[in-house]
């Protein structure tokens, strides 16, 4: 309890072994990191935990910088780092909202982040299980080097370069609303803990920042890319098994350097209105086996599932404007779904329960009808692997990182449980 106001030229509050906020009102204005724990020789320490209270952080560096884990389980947390998203990513230094080397876990509370750099950044894995998170970023909204699990939190990214990025991404529950100037969700990164640590070490030793995102190229004759963008399936995984996911992207909507799998939930993608990016893009296998998917994008780059097994899907070259009403009906005239697009579009991909590949469906845009046969149209993903199913590596467990094991629900990933309240 109580009130603390701190204004510092460098770091605000620093706990060598750990730092826990259990209540009260804390306001920090710092030239460096606002909250920090940097114990680097004991895996059970070096964490920052926010259990309760009202915490307001304004920092020139990172809002929260934890050497091991950053855990938020309650309270109201507001972070402005590096001048906020409007300032853009700094040319030197780090100005992330929440940064941790091992795990970031959000399992409650209300968190608001306005960051010049990544809003949430883990060099290992992260899990967003409950609570409300609102973020604006000058770079990535939510970024992890290896695994990201979203299994219940309400996550809104209003501004970002890429809204959600990591090697192994699983969304199984919650409400996820993402806006980006490039890819909305990008499965690009490491798929093992060891590879993630190596990537971080290489990045730290390299003074030149490298964009690891695979660029989608305009397709040339024969389905091959014009230019140097890699189409290789490198094993990343983007998996949606539940929840409500909405993506508004100027680059690819859902993009995986490996496989893309949707088996349940409600997924809406507003992709680019023009250019050679698409609503759905994967270098490996793409499948829609359940749930409801509606995706709007340009007709210049249309990728569709690599399999016709399971739930049916249609891809229709239907054109509309921002605000157009799109209705999908079956052969008997029954309405399967009605949607309003936020952007101009030249193609619609749709799938929902009860659709059968080989059957005929109608996609109507403001009353203009286009017929499409389910399971046909567009191009299969995985251009770098012969236009056929790719998919490398096993499926990550539903709700946990694919390689490194499940992070504890609310405790540090490497060490012991942080105290529920300050000791002593």
Task: Tell where the protein language model's regions lie, with residue ranges.
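A composition-driven surface/loop motif
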Residues: 1-424
């Amino acid at each position: 309890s109580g009130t603390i106001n701190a204004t510092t030229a460098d770091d605000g509050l620093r706990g060598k072994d750990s730092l826990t906020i259990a209540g009260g009102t804390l306001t920090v204005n710092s030239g460096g990191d606002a909250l920090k724990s940097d114990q680097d020789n004991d895996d059970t320490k070096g964490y920052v935990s926010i259990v309760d209270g009202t915490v307001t952080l304004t920092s020139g560096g990172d809002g929260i910088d934890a050497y091991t884990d950053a855990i938020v389980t309650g309270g109201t947390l507001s972070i402005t780092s590096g001048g906020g998203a409007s300032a853009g990513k700094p040319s030197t230094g780090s100005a992330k909202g929440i940064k941790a080397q091992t795990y970031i876990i959000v399992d409650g509370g209300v968190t608001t982040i306005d960051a010049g750099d990544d809003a949430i950044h883990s060099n290992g894995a992260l899990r967003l299980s409950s609570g409300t998170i609102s973020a604006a970023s000058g770079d990535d909204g939510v970024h992890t080097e290896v695994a990201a699990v979203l299994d219940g939190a309400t996550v809104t990214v209003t501004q970002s370069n890429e809204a959600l990025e990591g090697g192994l991404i699983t969304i199984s529950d919650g409400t996820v609303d993402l806006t980006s100037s490039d890819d909305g969700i990008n499965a690009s990164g490491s798929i093992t803990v060891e590879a993630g640590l190596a990537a971080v070490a290489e990045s730290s030793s390299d003074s030149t920042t490298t964009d690891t995102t695979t660029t989608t190229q305009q397709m040339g004759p024969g389905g091959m890319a014009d230019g140097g963008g890699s189409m290789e399936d490198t094993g990343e995984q983007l998996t949606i098994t539940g929840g409500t996911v909405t993506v508004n992207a100027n680059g690819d909507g859902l993009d995986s350097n490996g496989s893309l799998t949707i088996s349940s939930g409600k997924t809406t993608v507003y992709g680019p209105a023009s250019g050679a990016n698409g609503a759905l893009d994967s270098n490996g296998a793409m499948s829609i086996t359940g749930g409801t998917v509606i995706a709007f994008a340009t007709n210049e780059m249309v990728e569709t599932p690599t399999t016709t097994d399971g739930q049916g899907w249609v891809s229709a070259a239907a054109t509309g404007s921002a605000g157009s009403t799109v209705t999908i009906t079956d052969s008997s005239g029954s309405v399967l779904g009605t949607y309003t697009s936020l952007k101009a579009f030249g193609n619609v991909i749709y799938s929902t329960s009860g659709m059968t590949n080989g059957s005929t469906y109608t996609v109507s845009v403001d009353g203009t009808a286009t017929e499409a046969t389910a399971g046909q149209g567009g191009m299969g993903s995985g251009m770098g692997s012969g236009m056929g199913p790719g998919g490398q590596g096993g499926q990550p467990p539903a709700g946990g990182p694919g390689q490194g094991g499940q992070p504890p629900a609310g405790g540090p990933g490497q060490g012991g449980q942080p105290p529920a309240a300050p000791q002593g």
